[in-house]
C-alpha cells in the first residue's frame, strides 16, 4: 500500500507541476528594430508589459538592413520588424515575408558632438564642412551597407556638395576617418562618449536622447522635409542587397520609419496587439518625448492588407 500511495502522490505532483509550468508561460513576441529606436522601444515595452503581464516583448536592435537580413538570410524567427527606412521592408521583405508596412515616424540628420569636441564653439551650419575636414578632427558615421543612417549620411554630404557648390566635398568626407565607421548609428555614441571621436553624423532623436550637443543642417540636405523630396531624390547610392554579392540602388528620400508584422510571425495575434499599443496615443507620445516625431496619420501602400485593428491609425484624427 505504501508503494502505491507514493506512486499516486508523486504522479499527482508531476502532473500538477506540468500544469503549473504551462499556465505560467509568457507569450514571447520577438521584435527586430533599428538601433535608433532602442530608447523609445524599451519604454513602450515597459508600459505594455505592465498592462499585459502574460506577454514578454523581446527586443533585438541592429542596423535596419541587418535586421532584414536576419530574416531573409539567417531565417531567424521574428514577429515584428521596425525599420528606420520604409525602403528596407518594401524592397527586402515584401511580398515574400510580409505583405504590408506602416510608415509611422520621421527624423533628421544632424552633426553631434560634446563639450570636449574640438572646435565645438565654432561649429555651425556653415562651418561644419571645414571643421570636419581638419586633420586633428575625427568624425564617425554608420555603415551604409548595414544601416540607413549610413547611406543617409552620404546623401547629406552629396546634397551639401550641391547646396554649397563645394565640388568634391562628398568624396573627401567619405574617404576620411573610415576606421570609425560602425554597423549602426547608436554604436557611434560610445565612440563620442569615450572621446575617441569629435563628431558624428547622427539622427536628431539619438542626439536628444543622449544629451549631446548638435547642429541642425539646412532642410535641403537633412532629409527631414517632404517638400524637399525632389531635391533628396537627386542623389543615390548602391548598397549591399538581400543576397551576398548583390547590390541594390537606394535613392534619397524624406526619412520614414516603418513597421510590420511578418506573415510567419510565431505570435502574430499578440504582435498585432503590441503594435496597436505602440501606434496608439500612449506609444506615440513616448516616441515624441524622445525626439522621434510621429507621422500622423500614418501611411501605407497596402491599405487593403493592414490588420483590422490598425486601420484606425491610417485615418485623419478628428
PLM feature spans:
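Positively charged n-region of N-terminal signal peptides that target proteins for export
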Residues: 1-4
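Bacterial N-terminal signal peptides
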Residues: 6-14
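Residues that line or immediately flank small-molecule/substrate-binding pockets and catalytic motifs
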Residues: 8, 85, 204
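Exported/periplasmic ABC-transporter solute-binding proteins
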Residues: 18-52, 56-60, 65, 72, ...
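Short beta-strand-centered segments that line the small-molecule binding cleft or hinge
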Residues: 74, 78-85, 89-103
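Acidic, polar low-complexity intrinsically disordered regions
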Residues: 104-108
